[in-house]
Amino acid sequence: MACKHLPFLALAGVLLAYLCSQSEAASNFDCCLTYTKNVYHHARNFVGFTTQMADEACDINAIIFHLKSKRSVCADPKQIWVKRILHLLSLRTKKM
């Protein structure tokens, strides 16, 4: 009787191992954990941005600014300076 269930148990084990590896992969995202304390006044050093939403992978909402120096800056989307830089970047892309 046990031999009848062995293929099913083996398949269930493989499926469980696959699902566990997928959930680990989802947690490997680079998320902003804190916001920068610096205030940036000029958009000239920024080349773009990414929006991070708080969901299963990341804990906080953030704007990730990408700088010419290949660095990234995590900013609070509620801050006035962040909204101003986003506006300036959108104007820059409309001109292109």
Curated annotation (Swiss-Prot):
Organism of origin: Rattus norvegicus (Rat)
The name this protein goes by in its record: C-C motif chemokine 20
Record-level Gene Ontology MF annotations: CCR6 chemokine receptor binding; chemokine activity; cytokine activity
Disulphide-bonded residues: 31-58, 32-74
Predominant subcellular localization, coarse grouping: secreted
Similarity field: Belongs to the intercrine beta (chemokine CC) family.
A GO-annotated cellular component: extracellular space
Tissue: Low levels in thymus and lung.
N-terminal signal peptide: 1-26
Keyword field contains Secreted: yes
InterPro entries: Chemokine_b/g/d, Chemokine_CC_DCCL, Chemokine_IL8-like_dom, Interleukin_8-like_sf
Top-level taxon of origin: Eukaryota
Gene3D superfamilies named among the record's database cross-references: 2.40.50.40
Function: Acts as a ligand for C-C chemokine receptor CCR6. Signals through binding and activation of CCR6 and induces a strong chemotactic response and mobilization of intracellular calcium ions. The ligand-receptor pair CCL20-CCR6 is responsible for the chemotaxis of dendritic cells (DC), effector/memory T-cells and B-cells and plays an important role at skin and mucosal surfaces under homeostatic and inflammatory conditions, as well as in pathology, including cancer and autoimmune diseases. CCL20 acts as a chemotactic factor that attracts lymphocytes and, slightly, neutrophils, but not monocytes.
Gene Ontology biological process terms from the UniProt entry: calcium-mediated signaling; cell chemotaxis; cellular response to lipopolysaccharide; cellular response to lipoteichoic acid; chemotaxis; immune response; inflammatory response; positive regulation of interleukin-1 alpha production
Subcellular location: Secreted
SMART domains referenced in this protein's UniProt entry, alphabetically: SCY
Induction of synthesis: By TNF in experimental allergic panencaphalomyelitis (EAP) and by TNF and IL-1 in primary astrocytes.
Keywords from the UniProt entry: Chemotaxis, Cytokine, Disulfide bond, Inflammatory response, Secreted, Signal
A family per Pfam: IL8
PANTHER family: C-C MOTIF CHEMOKINE 20, SMALL INDUCIBLE CYTOKINE A
SUPFAM superfamilies: Interleukin 8-like chemokines
